[in-house]
A protein has these predicted regions:
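Structural motif
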Residues: 11-13, 115, 144-147, 176, ...
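A short, aliphatic-rich alpha-helical micro-motif
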Residues: 5, 140, 184-188
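Conserved phosphate-binding/catalytic loop of the ribokinase/pfkB sugar-kinase fold
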Residues: 91-98, 103-140
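Substrate-binding N-lobe of the ribokinase-like
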Residues: 2, 7-9, 31, 35-101
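Conserved phosphate/ATP/ADP-binding segment of small-molecule kinases
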Residues: 154, 158-221
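Positively charged, low-complexity intrinsically disordered leader regions
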Residues: 1-27
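Short acidic, glycine-rich surface-loop motifs adjacent to enzyme active sites
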Residues: 142-155
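Gly-rich Lys/Arg/Thr-decorated short loops/hinges at beta-loop-alpha junctions or inter-strand turns
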Residues: 31-38, 109-122, 195-202
C-alpha cells in the first residue's frame, strides 16, 4: 500500500492501555470460596491498546509519535515509562482525576485463569478537545500516515475523529482506522477502516456469517 525508500513517519492517535501479566502457580483451593489461590512469582508490563500498535510499528522500523490522554495515576506513569523505553516521541495531554486503563491477566502454570480491568472512560472537555486538535493540526504535515487506534476509552471522540480525518485529507495524508463501537460515521472519509467481523456486523446490523451478506456489507461500509 505504501512504498518508501526511507522509514515512514507515522502519527498514532488513540487509547493507551497498560497490559499487566501476573505469573504464578497454585497448589491449593481458597477456604473462602471454591477458587484457586495463586502464588505470584513474577510480573511484567507491556503497552496495550494504541500502545500495541506503536510497539509493532516501532519494531518494523517506522518513526512513530503518539497523541493521547493520560492522567497523574500510577498506570499513566508506567505507560509513560514504557513509551520512553522505546524512545517514542509523545504528545500527551493530562486529564486530572482520571484512571488510565489497565488490564491485568493472571496465569497459573502458563494457563490464564483470570483477567480484571481497572479504568474509567474519558469524558473529554471541549477545551481539551480543542488542544488535541490544535496539536495535531500543527504537526500533521510532518507525517506520512496517521493511524486512529480507537479502543472506546474516550480519546477518540466524534469531534476529534472527524477533525483528524479532515485535517489529514487536506494535506493528502492517509488515515487508517482501527474502529470501536457501532458509530462508524465518525470515521467517514478515512482512507482505510479495519473492523473485524464482529465489529462490522454490529455496526452495520448485518449478519456476516451469511456469505451473501458480505458484498452488501462492503458496499455499505
Amino acid at each position: 500500500m505504501f512504498e518508501y525508500s526511507k522509514k515512514p513517519k507515522i502519527l498514532v492517535i488513540g487509547d493507551l492501555i497498560l497490559d499487566q501479566y501476573l505469573w504464578g502457580h497454585s497448589s491449593r483451593i481458597s477456604p473462602e470460596a471454591p477458587v484457586p489461590v495463586i502464588d505470584i512469582t513474577s510480573k511484567n508490563f507491556s503497552l496495550g491498546g494504541a500502545g500495541n500498535v506503536i510497539r509493532n510499528l516501532n519494531s518494523l522500523g517506522a518513526k512513530v509519535e503518539v497523541v493521547s490522554v493520560l492522567s497523574e495515576c500510577s498506570t499513566s506513569k508506567k505507560l509513560k515509562g514504557l513509551l520512553k523505553d522505546l524512545k517514542i516521541k509523545t504528545h500527551l495531554f493530562t486529564q486530572k482525576n482520571h484512571i488510565a486503563s489497565k488490564k491485568t491477566r493472571v496465569f497459573s502454570s502458563r494457563s490464564q485463569v483470570l483477567r480484571f480491568d481497572s479504568e474509567d472512560k474519558l469524558d473529554l472537555s471541549s477545551s481539551l478537545e480543542i488542544k488535541i486538535i490544535n496539536k495535531i493540526s500543527s504537526k500533521i504535515k510532518e507525517f506520512d500516515c496517521v493511524i486512529i487506534s480507537d479502543y472506546g476509552k474516550g480519546v477518540i471522540s466524534k469531534n476529534i475523529s472527524k477533525s483528524i480525518i479532515k485535517i489529514s485529507n487536506s494535506f493528502s495524508i492517509k488515515v487508517l482506522v482501527d474502529p470501536k463501537g457501532t458509530d462508524f460515521i465518525k470515521y467517514k472519509d478515512c482512507y482505510l477502516l479495519t473492523p473485524n467481523k464482529k465489529e462490522a456486523s454490529e455496526a452495520l446490523k448485518i449478519d456476516l456469517e451469511v456469505k451473501n451478506n458480505i458484498k452488501p456489507a462492503l458496499l455499505k461500509l
